[in-house]
Amino acid sequence: MKRYICVLAIIIILIIIGLHNLGVVFFDYNKVYALDGNEGIYEAMVLSKKSETDYKITYIIKLQNNLNEESANKETANKKDKNESNEIFSEKKFLLDIKKKDFEDELDYGTIIEFNGVYNKPNSKRNYGGYDYSLYLKTQSIYGTFEGTNVNVKIKNKGNFINRCIISFKTYIKSVLEANLEENEANLCIGLLIGDRTNLDEEIEEDFKTSNLTHMLAVSGSHFVYIILAMTYITKLFKRKRLGQIIMLIAIILFMNLTGNTGSVVRSGIMAILGVVASLLYRKSDMWTNMSIAILIQVIINPYIIFDIGVQLSYGGVIGIVLFNDIINDRLVKICGLFRVQKEGIRNKVIKYVYESISVTLSANIVIIPIMMLNFNTISLSFVISNLLAGSIMGVLVIYAFILVFLSIIFKTLISPLFIILNLMLKLLIFIAHICSLLPFSKIYVVTPNIVLIIAFYVIIYLFYKQVNNKEGKIRHKNILVISLIVVILINFIFPVITSKRKHLEINFIDVGQGDSTLIRVNNKNILIDGGGSSYGEKFDVGERILFPYLLDRGINKLDYVIVSHFDSDHCQGLNFVMENMKVENAIISSLGQESSEYNTFISLAQKQNTNLIFVKKGDRIKIGNSFIKVLYPGNELITDNAKNNNAIVFKFIWKNISILFTGDIEEKAENMILNLYEDNLEELEATILKVAHHGSKTSTTKAFLEAVNPKIALIGVGEDNNFGHPNSGVIERLKSIGCKIYRTDECGEITITCKNGLKIHEMLSMK
């Protein structure tokens, strides 16, 4: 009894410490965020390189001092402010962006630098259900980003000696693999051994994602199993078992540091350490205890770690294996009409491996499926096959690769021929990932599940587990079936109420950066107007990374209408991925003045997906329930100057007494033509809401056009810190002069307008 009281007391104390830390850290972040835009001269130590592009390198740094020079005659108050900001920033981790044109040399761990910097706090979610960058950085204990210039190296080779040795060894591993393997194979092997995917080929990485093998590229519990297995054989060389176990502990700690101490690595490492310590103390290791201690330690160190998706998947996988592995393995044996294999032999070992691999994979996925659906909107029905095939060589590959790396220290080029075998194994793994990515149902997109569904899923799983493990030792299949049916029926009664027919209008002006995209939901119909995209063909796919996940987060798996105002990439490019992966019933477009490769691509895609194409021009009306679309422009006369922009579809969406005018990227010439077309009936142009043309460019939104439209609300789709000077200050002044309320995606994030008993406007960046 005393033992349980002690354990309970320890748990309560640890929880109190964790809550205290959460409060301290929460206010700590807010203090730092309050200094957004702070500019100064800083001194920092480089911890590691985070990422690299063609234009800049991003480092993780630990800030040490604020070196703003102050003359002797400056006011005391200013000195106090400087000291306070120095105290707030000091000893905290930040990202430092350095443009390559300003500083070409790479910085190593332990380098003390001085730089001019502007602090930028990280963005939170910019769209509903979107990526929360600030939360991601909090899981890494990073407080934001500095834009660095005038970088000067003051001291090299500072920092922890052990860390320098580990980083040197990591660099050595990379150099050995790059020197002895083909490029793609070397980069994959680096990812498998130390979790560094920086240079991994995008197609190979995508194949691993699609085939549900990403966990192999992120160092996880399986890697520690391989390391412990290898170390077990090595420590058998020692006559003293305890000495071997101590060496194993050291190896685990070094491996944790070698792979970057990510959340999932720390979880695996702590549990592995506790297992070895239990053996040292002649105690039985308990998975639940080890897991509880691991999460408590991690939460005490960083309370935000629970929001790390890798950590959630790591713990979820372990919980699934602990709960269901033996159950599934036993059932597989019985289903196949075989008995548990006891005899040695290749055939029996293969059968045993197949059973164990399937049961481990299934049991882990039982728990993590909702996490995958919630965070990635995907499920896979072929994960068993891919993990069975890839897992068969993964363990041997990792151990063999590490052996070669260590042997190369002594024998250097003498063992180069042995790398041929490793290269072939890596080619085989790449082939398996590619083939498995092509399997049917390898990647199924699903809408983001409602919290009710997630709870129901875990309730059913819990009930299933309880039934299987009831004291009578019998599985009451009927009870499981009845309970599951009751839960499903309840959900079916609840959801019609939650998702009943939308009787009001909701306009979601989506933040897609330097582009336009609007979702309108009315009469149980989903209408998407434009899809954003890249103006210069960057690798970032707005459709895949922002728009498609956004629609799934909104619970949308089918679009009734897609409207393309014109075929500039920043309006249509994001639609391609959506069209490829979601049913689109109708596409409303204009062929007038839109001849381009983007137009041809869209037409081909629509025909391939059996999307009904509706070509419109001035005077057309499309009724959608109790709302309708009225096309105002273009007519038969086209503008040849900047044709795509100036011949964009201009239309009004009208619902009851609310109207919104969409103007694409039209410029002054098109606005003047529209004014001439409706000079005898200017009230046709009046609208409650105006989607400002061309992102607020100075070539659009003339005074005469604004006076004719007379909007109460103006929406501007514009990228944060864009290079185009959008929106133009003159446009902003003209909008203000008519008393129009202005909402910009660079300042507001997504803008949601709900039309129900008046207009209610919500800005995503203010909804924190």
How would you name each of these model-derived features?
Residues 19-215, 545-552, 558, 592-594, ...:
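Membrane-interface helix/helix-cap signal primarily in integral membrane proteins
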Residues 139-271, 276, 366, 508, ...:
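Aromatic-rich juxtamembrane segments at the membrane interface
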Residues 57, 73-81, 102-118, 136, ...:
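Non-globular, low-confidence helical/coil segments that flank catalytic cores
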Residues 8, 202-383, 400, 446-500, ...:
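Hydrophobic alpha-helical transmembrane segments in multi-pass membrane proteins
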Residues 3-11:
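N-terminal alpha-helical targeting/anchoring segments
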Residues 12-31, 491-497:
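Transmembrane alpha-helices and immediately adjacent membrane-cytoplasm interface residues
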